């Protein structure tokens, strides 16, 4: 092994450990996988789902709980879809797998006008089929390959185009309460998954076989976030962290916080008494409005 190959191997090992750590932490933080779970891993043939399956198989060997993995691909009968690729790859792994055949492509083409993006309807049909199949095979969890950048992009898509503060949760119960969806890659940056897929030489299947243009709005958001992260490294990571530290009382949604019934309560002592000694650190660190008012009253400016 020459020096370059040795260096590449070291870099790959660091990347793999980082992704394993991200996935393991996400699973632990949201209790994604429990003892005896049968996890249906949705495999599209893209870099993210390949990476998710690879990492979950690796973690399965040393996990503190016993669980099963079942790989499932939905063949939507898109023209030119290479049907042999996924079975050939999965045959090399020690894993149960299923190829589900549903001609959702014809349905989408018959409903969506020519030139319009088919991604939305295609996604809904795919989701419905996978939910039903999960029940059929007794899966207790459905693992999807959305990563950290997908989650942040969805936040801004909803913010800019739908006027909603909404993203993708790492763990979700379906509306009919019959399925639990998990996103083990929730903490993983897309660039790490791209590098991992390249290093592992996964047989990637392109997502444009249907001829649909990539969702333009999502692409705009993706480019915006890439620009931000290039100019201000860590910006996307910080935005994701904000999704984990929400303060409902500092927003404006009456469904999350009862603004209507707010009342005064002066029974408790004030945070800062008028005659209490003050320091510059009091002025620098005070965030509560009540404290600020007391400080203004207490400090003799003139």
UniProtKB/Swiss-Prot annotation:
Its main location: cytoplasm. GO terms for cellular component: cytoplasm. It is found in: Cytoplasm. One of its GO terms (biological process) is tRNA thio-modification. The keyword Nucleotidyltransferase does not apply. Catalyzes the ATP-dependent 2-thiolation of cytidine in position 32 of tRNA, to form 2-thiocytidine (s(2)C32). The sulfur atoms are provided by the cysteine/cysteine desulfurase (IscS) system. The thiolation reaction likely consists of two steps: a first activation step by ATP to form an adenylated intermediate of the target base of tRNA, and a second nucleophilic substitution step of the sulfur (S) atom supplied by the hydrosulfide attached to the Fe-S cluster. Homodimer. Belongs to the TtcA family. NCBIfam families: PRK10696.1. This is tRNA-cytidine(32) 2-sulfurtransferase. It comes from Teredinibacter turnerae (strain ATCC 39867 / T7901). The lineage of its organism: Bacteria, Pseudomonadati, Pseudomonadota, Gammaproteobacteria, Cellvibrionales.
């Amino acid at each position: 092994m020459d020096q370059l190959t040795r260096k590449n191997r070291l870099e790959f090992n660091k990347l793999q450990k980082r992704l394993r750590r991200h996935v393991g932490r996400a699973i632990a933080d949201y209790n994604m996988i429990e003892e005896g779970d049968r996890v249906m891993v949705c495999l599209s043939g893209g870099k993210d789902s390949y990476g998710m399956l690879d990492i979950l198989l690796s973690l399965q060997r040393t996990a503190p709980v016993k669980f099963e993995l079942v790989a499932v691909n939905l063949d939507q009968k898109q023209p030119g879809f290479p049907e042999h690729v996924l079975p050939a790859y999965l045959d090399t792994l020690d894993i149960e797998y299923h190829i589900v055949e549903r001609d959702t492509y014809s349905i989408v083409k018959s409903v969506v006008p020519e030139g319009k993006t088919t991604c939305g309807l295609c996604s809904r049909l795919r989701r419905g089929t996978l939910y039903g199949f999960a029940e059929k095979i007794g899966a207790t969890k459905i693992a999807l390959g959305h990563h950290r950048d997908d989650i942040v992009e969805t936040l801004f898509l909803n913010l800019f185009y739908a006027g909603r503060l909404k993203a993708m949760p790492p763990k979700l119960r379906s509306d009919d309460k019959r399925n639990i969806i998990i996103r083990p890659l929730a903490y993983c940056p897309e660039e790490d998954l791209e590098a991992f897929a390249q290093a592992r030489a996964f047989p990637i299947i392109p997502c444009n076989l249907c001829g649909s243009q990539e969702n333009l709005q999502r692409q705009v958001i993706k480019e915006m976030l890439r620009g931000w992260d290039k100019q201000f490294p860590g910006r996307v990571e910080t935005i994701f962290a904000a999704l984990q530290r929400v303060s409902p009382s500092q927003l404006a949604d009456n469904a999350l916080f009862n603004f209507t019934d707010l009342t005064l309560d002066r029974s408790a002592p004030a945070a800062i008494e008028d005659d209490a000694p003050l320091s510059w650190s009091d002025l620098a660190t005070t965030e509560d409005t009540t404290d600020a008012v007391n400080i203004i009253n207490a400090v003799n400016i003139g």
